[in-house]
Amino acid sequence: MSRRALRRLRGEQRGQEPLGPDALQFVLLDDDDAEEEGPKTGLGGRRPGGAGKEGVRVNNRFELINIEDLEDDLVVNGERSDCTLPDSASSGNKGRAKHGNPENKQDGDAAAKAGSSEQSNASGKLRKKKKKQKNKKSCTGESSENGLEDIDRILERIEDSSGFSHPGPPPLSSRKHVLYVEHRHLNPDTELKRYFGARAVLGEQRPRQRQRVYPKCTWLTTPKSTWPRYSKPGLSMRLLESKKGLSFFAFEHSEEYQQAQHKFLVAVESMEPNNIVALLQTSPYHVDSLLQLSDACRFQEDQEMARDLIGEPAYPHLLPMEKSWCRRPHWSFYLALYKQMSFLEKRGCPRTALEYCKLILSLEPDEDPLCMLLLIDHMALRARNYEYLIRLFQEWEAHRNLSQLPNFAFSVPLAYFLLSQQTDLPDHELSSARQQASLLIQQALTMFPGVLMPLLEYCSVRPDATVSNHRFFGPDAEISQPPALSQLVSLYLGRSHFLWKEPAIMSWLEENVHEVLEAVDSGDPAVEACENRRKVLYQRAPRNIHRHVILSEIKEAVAALPSDVTTQSVMGFDPLPPVDTIYSYVRPERLSPVSHGNTIALFFRSLLPNYTTEGERLEEGVAGGPNRNQGLNRLMLAVRDMMANFHFNDLEVPREDNPEGEGDWD
């Protein structure tokens, strides 16, 4: 009988039986054991089976794969524990022994018992080592915590001495600042997705997965694919100091940006938008040019282009927290934020516009150069964030006297009333909000009686005879108020009158109007005190209110501006700059005409004041000097412009029948 048939009868497979005493027996040694018993190895580097510490005998080479994983798991604190083959290897040996002779079976059982005893010893050693490791970890953890506390103390000392601080996250119990800006609400797409869903907002704008491009986004705006590639525009921010969690920055213009600013001022004087477009081709992120061109597009009713041009100036900027408002370079940044906020409100994103309003106010809350306090109440009501408006009024009334502004005097009670109309609040909170709303609206009507009749006229509501004929709310109340107060009232009514058109609000307002009339007829001393206060407080509006009125573009408020403001030349990129404006660089003046110039050039300069030869213009870093042909071309263009403006009147040729030109007199 052949060996193949004999193996089949025994149930064995080829390659599993041992070929010899040391043919396929490999011994796995630890590194330390291998070093100690290295000289004792026999020929071929093999170790005898029963010498010293028993290693792992492997009859199948593929069992070595599982042993590597076992060795990695049994490494504790850099030491290796004694172990045997894994269960899979031992079970495999047992399975093969069952099909063999009885002697092999007995040998397999003995090996299994020995393996189990060795495993128990190894597990006991592992438990002891784990306990030691836990003790070591606890000791090292305590020492590391003490080290971190020492590091924190050192950092606090350094911050106190240098003035620099690294603000950490506030504790959970602390309340956020009233002007805290939530970055997730600065993205208008987030608000639009909440209203209409992501599919309706994005639509076909979703790029394919393979063609997806991830541009560098900022908190203020998200760049579009149609925008020019961003490069260093020459506008940078320098950290002045960091103190008590606030960072103070200063905007700096490079030399190239200053040259672009000079070209922009020349383009504005030319009154030609195409010159600004040509400037943007070389300086695509020049802020003043983008603001001016956005206004030109808005006047031409191209709202989409105007909104994109406003978003570009905010792209390269970070969020500054600066105190020096009178510094000229960042004036454009304020205007860009304000105009972007206006576009967001018109787009139907009042929650995002409220965050922009908080951002602008947080940059300079004391000075408030754009007078955002005249607008933040309107944004809060439009966003239906009544709790925020009430909180702002409660925290700032003590030191800012917000009740002296007509917009806060009427918006805060309106917020209380709208809050009392919500059904998800308890009954006692609803009743207290209604009482507070009635109390505040009566104080507002007593302080500003000239608001009622124009408000009812805006809402197309005709008051009853007792109100319209009363002297307190009659026409005299509107005429007798100071001009500065008239500006504030016109600004508030032109912006927020539609918030009062609901029937429930009008019925509530009517009740409180009658309460005020009863107090006036009864001779309440608060009425006379409010009248005296109006005469003292509203003598003349400050410059930031005039600037806010110009930026708002509300016709009624602009018409109420004083004559000294309306007669000034107001530029869209620089409306009513502060009186104490500090210019970081001075625009070079044009060269005055010289007497020894060319006679033809002097003649055309007398006819065309804007004409200048190439030699008289400043050389803005152009290598090679001016070209003579360019001066000749400018001269020819000036001649053509002059000839195009000439108009010749043809003399009447006398008729043949009346050669002397004598006519009959009627």
UniProtKB/Swiss-Prot annotation:
Source taxonomy: Eukaryota, Metazoa, Chordata, Craniata, Vertebrata
Assembly notes: Component of the ribosome quality control complex (RQC), composed of the E3 ubiquitin ligase LTN1, TCF25 and NEMF associated with the 60S ribosomal subunit. Interacts (via C-terminus) with NFATC4; the interaction leads to suppresson of NFATC4 transcription factor activity and is reduced following stimulation with angiotensin-2. Interacts with XIAP.
Keywords: Cytoplasm, Nucleus, Phosphoprotein, Repressor, Transcription, Transcription regulation
Role, per record: Component of the ribosome quality control complex (RQC), a ribosome-associated complex that mediates ubiquitination and extraction of incompletely synthesized nascent chains for proteasomal degradation. In the RQC complex, required to promote formation of 'Lys-48'-linked polyubiquitin chains during ubiquitination of incompletely synthesized proteins by LTN1. May negatively regulate the calcineurin-NFAT signaling cascade by suppressing the activity of transcription factor NFATC4. May play a role in cell death control.
Organism for this UniProt entry: Rattus norvegicus (Rat)
Annotated GO CC locations: cytosol; nucleus; RQC complex
Chain positions found as Phosphoserine: S592
Region (Disordered): 1-59, 79-146
Record's protein name: Ribosome quality control complex subunit TCF25
Segments of skewed composition (Basic and acidic residues): 100-110
Family: Belongs to the TCF25 family.
Any one GO BP annotation for this protein: rescue of stalled ribosome
